[in-house]
Amino acid sequence: MTKGKLLTTPSRLLKLVLPLSTVDHNTDRKDVAPLALLVHPQQPLSYLERLIQAELPPPDPQDSKSTTRSVTFRAMEAKDDEIKPRKKADTEGGGGSDGSVQSYSGAGREGEGKDEGEFVRWSPSTEIGDFIRDAARAKEFEVEIEGSPGVIKVAVPSFNDRTYYLRQRLRRTSRKISKLAAIKEECDKAAHRGAQRIALAGCGGLIGYWYIVYRLTFETDLGWDVMEPVTYLVGLSTLIGGYMWFLWHNREVSYRSALNITVSARQNKLYQAKGFSLQDWEGYLEEANAMRREIKAVASEYDVDWNETQDEGGDEKVTKALRDERKNNNGTKNKSKEGEEDDEDD
C-alpha cells in the first residue's frame, strides 16, 4: 500500500487509512500495516495531527529537539484558482470570471485529466470537512510527516463517496415509503368516498325532512299552526345538538371540520384493517427528509447538483409525501415563531 485512503462510514465519520512508515534501514522487513483513524468532519486538522503523532515513534534526539514529529497537510491549489482583484465592477450584480471567486468541484478521486497546480499547506485549525472540500478539486492531498522518507498521497473522496451510505439509506427508506404510500393512498381514497356518502346521506335526510313537513303541513289536517312550533323545535334542537357535538370534539364550527373528523375516523379504521402504522409512516418521512438535508449540505459543500429524484426511487408518490412533510414542518415552525413573537409583544 503506497497511498492513503479517506473513506466514509455508516456512522457518518471519516475513516483515514495511512500507510505509516518510519525510517528503517532493514531491507528484509515486510510492509508496515496501514493505520486507520476515525475522525469527524467538524474536527480540526490539529486533532487529526495529534492522532497521527500518537502512533509515531519519537524523533531522534540528535536530529530534532522536539519530542514529537510534526505533521503537515497540503492540498493542491489549481492555477486557475489564483485569487485576483476584479478588473471591472459588475453593476448588474452578476458574477464575473475574473473576480476573486474560487471554483469548486466534487469530482475528487473520480476527476478526469491531470491535476495542475502546487500544494499549499493548510492551517491545523481548519476543519477537516473544509479541508476535504477544497482538496476535492484535485484527486489527492498530501500528508507530510517529519522524518519520513516521503509524503503520503491520500485519495480525496468525491461527493458520491461522501454520501454513499446516506444515499443507500435514503433509497431503502424510500422503498419503504413507496410501499406504505400505496396502502395509504388506497385507504385515504376509501375514507373520502365514505365521507362523501355520509354527506350525501345527510343531504337526502334534509330533503326527506322537508318533504315530510310539506306533506304534514299542506296535505293533512295538522296545518301550519301545529307544524310551525314542531319545525322550530326540531331546527333549534338540531342546532344545539350540532353545536354541542363540535364542542365535545373541540373543533371549529364548520363543514370542513365535520368532514375532517369523519374522514379521520374512517382512515384510522382502514389503517388498522390494512396493517398501516401511521407512526412508522411519519418516522420514515422524518428520517428520509433528515438524510436529504444532510446530502444537500454535502452537495452544497462540493458545489454539485444532486439529483434527489433518482435516490428517492423515482416514485412521484415518495417525492410528494416528502415535500408535503417538509411543508407541514415549515408551517408548524412558522406558527410557533409567530406565537413566540406574540408572547414577547404581550
Swiss-Prot record:
It catalyses: Ca(2+)(in) = Ca(2+)(out). One of its GO terms (molecular function) is uniporter activity. This is Calcium uniporter protein, mitochondrial. Highly selective calcium channel localized to the inner mitochondrial membrane, which mediates calcium uptake into the mitochondrial matrix. Mitochondrial calcium homeostasis plays key roles in cellular physiology and regulates ATP production, cytoplasmic calcium signals and activation of cell death pathways. Sufficient to operate as a pore-forming channel without the need of calcium-sensor or auxiliary subunit. It is found in: Mitochondrion inner membrane. It holds the Pfam family MCU. Homotetramer, assembles in a dimer or dimers configuration with two interfaces. A motif (Selectivity filter) lies at residues 224-232. The lineage of its organism: Eukaryota, Fungi, Dikarya, Ascomycota, Pezizomycotina. GO terms for biological process: calcium import into the mitochondrion; mitochondrial calcium ion homeostasis; protein homotetramerization. Ca(2+) binds at E228. Keywords: Calcium, Calcium channel, Calcium transport, Ion channel, Ion transport, Membrane, Metal-binding, Mitochondrion, Mitochondrion inner membrane, Transmembrane, Transmembrane helix, Transport. The gene is MCU. Residues 55-120, 306-346 are annotated as: Disordered. Residues 1-195, 249-346 are mitochondrial matrix. InterPro entries: MCU_C, MCU_fam. Belongs to the MCU (TC 1.A.77) family. Residues 217-226 are mitochondrial intermembrane. It comes from the Eukaryota. The chain crosses the membrane at residues 196-216, 227-248. The keyword ATP-binding does not apply. The selectivity filter, in which calcium ions are arranged in single file, is composed of two acidic rings separated by one helical turn along the central axis of the channel pore. It is a multi-pass membrane protein. PANTHER family: CALCIUM UNIPORTER PROTEIN, MITOCHONDRIAL. GO terms for cellular component: mitochondrial inner membrane; uniplex complex.
